[in-house]
Amino acid sequence: MAVSSTPWALVALFLMASSTVMAIPPRKAIDVPFGRNYVPTWAFDHQKQLNGGSELQLILDKYTGTGFQSKGSYLFGHFSMHIKLPAGDTAGVVTAFYLSSTNNEHDEIDFEFLGNRTGQPVILQTNVFTGGKGNREQRIYLWFDPSKAYHTYSVLWNLYQIVFFVDNIPIRVFKNAKDLGVRFPFNQPMKLYSSLWNADDWATRGGLEKTNWANAPFIASYRGFHIDGCQASVEAKYCATQGRMWWDQNEFRDLDAEQYRRLKWVRMKWTIYNYCTDRTRFPVMPAECRRDRDV
């Protein structure tokens, strides 16, 4: 039988070929109820828990968005969430899943899903803030429709690197480059947050496309509320020095050859913006970019 040449078929072939030599992925998250590790933070009446708290819906309408956060703060670990994004015409709508500290010179690790008009792909924007400095945006298209089913978005964070994953495929690496003068998140515990809100002043085509409220309510669905991190709400020094957790071990200090191959695939096929190659904003390439293999 002839093989289809559609983009989706090519993606499937790539993933099947990759599965023959699998890199070591982060551990699979364990599903637990929302209330075990998270609490609502605003617009409680725009959230709905289903199936005994194993599933959560965030609801955005013309009046308000909504959000939640983790109960504890964490310093290093593996942080994941199963998310199904709002469907249809979602221009102007942003769904975010991120870690952030709370002080002025804050650290932050971001997934932001930027909605689009019906038929146009959602954009996934990632960013890393260190010591209050961000401006490290990367944007990709996803190789699937993120509103059709749940997909897993996760961050591996240890003393050596931060890795963003989509369904265990690495889409971005931010290495510890302190020796190059680049700050790295290592001493500020972070909470996990997620929110759904209207950002039509910037999210879609730089704010040219406005939210169509005739399509509201917009609903983002969540599962997988386990947190596999070192809780530092009381004693951050323990998390920074103990080194016995699985994410500290040698196999998680760098990507292996197969993971770098997948990262290159994302960079070559799906990346639409990379701050490392933006010479208008950065005439001199940021120091971390070569180490992160982003050029």
Curated annotation (Swiss-Prot):
Reaction it catalyzes: breaks a beta-(1->4) bond in the backbone of a xyloglucan and transfers the xyloglucanyl segment on to O-4 of the non-reducing terminal glucose residue of an acceptor, which can be a xyloglucan or an oligosaccharide of xyloglucan
Highest taxon of source: Eukaryota
Keywords: Apoplast, Cell wall, Cell wall biogenesis/degradation, Disulfide bond, Glycoprotein, Glycosidase, Hydrolase, Secreted, Signal, Transferase
Chain positions recorded as xyloglucan binding sites: E112, Q125, T126, N127, N135, R136, E137, D201, W202, G206, R281
GO biological process: cell wall biogenesis; cell wall organization; xyloglucan metabolic process
Gene Ontology MF terms in the entry: hydrolase activity, hydrolyzing O-glycosyl compounds; polysaccharide binding; xyloglucan:xyloglucosyl transferase activity
EC nos: 2.4.1.207
Record carries keyword Cell wall biogenesis/degradation: yes
Compartments reported by the entry: Secreted, Cell wall; Secreted, Extracellular space, Apoplast
Keyword Disulfide bond: yes
Annotated GH16 domain residues: 25-222
PTM notes: Contains at least one intrachain disulfide bond essential for its enzymatic activity.
Signal sequence extent: 1-23
UniProt xrefs under InterPro entries: Beta-glucanase/XTH (IPR044791), ConA-like_dom_sf (IPR013320), GH16 (IPR000757), GH16_AS (IPR008263), XET_C (IPR010713), XTH (IPR016455)
Active site, renumbered: E108 (nucleophile), E112 (proton donor)
Entries under PROSITE patterns matching the protein: GH16_1, GH16_2
Glycosylation sites: N116
SUPFAM superfamilies: Concanavalin A-like lectins/glucanases
Disulfide bonds: C230-C239, C276-C289
GO CC, alphabetical: apoplast
Site (Important for catalytic activity): D110
Function: Catalyzes xyloglucan endohydrolysis (XEH) and/or endotransglycosylation (XET). Cleaves and religates xyloglucan polymers, an essential constituent of the primary cell wall, and thereby participates in cell wall construction of growing tissues.
Further comment found in the protein's record: No hydrolytic activity detected in vitro.
Family of this protein: Belongs to the glycosyl hydrolase 16 family. XTH group 1 subfamily.
Protein name per its UniProtKB record: Xyloglucan endotransglucosylase/hydrolase
Protein's organism: Brassica oleracea var. botrytis (Cauliflower)
Gene from which this protein is expressed: XET16A
